[in-house]
């Protein structure tokens, strides 16, 4: 992951609920699309993590872990806002997300009129389950027409499910894609009873 530096919370070893972690590259105008980079705000490096009512924001690779080794990590998120634009929840860990806001990061000057296609997830083989979550935008640049996908593969056997989620018109009709040719055929991608107001 690029543009990685410590937040104040990490410097003082703070963990808990009701945190706000916003990954910003020092000296960069992060509302400008040209500064979009991979930058973890929350990196999974432990088992049995529980996160409640936290705001976890960045652009790409906001929440997750890089690498292909499956260490059997498990995480639970409830009532959180998790934001980004590209694969902003990604990597090899199993997770359940209940009642979370999945927030598209918007940019003031991207080349597609602030409607840059993004991907919420890029899972490996461990499943991500989203229940009663809502897809939103950050609203930073007005009410723009963001249209993205639930996710894309990150290798064979990617696994993600969205159950009874509200997409607010921010997910395109295809819903899913792949990072490399042929991976989608072995992916386990599910949608159940989602709404699109």
Task: List each model region and its residues.
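Sequence-level preference for short, compositionally simple segments enriched
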Residues: 1-197
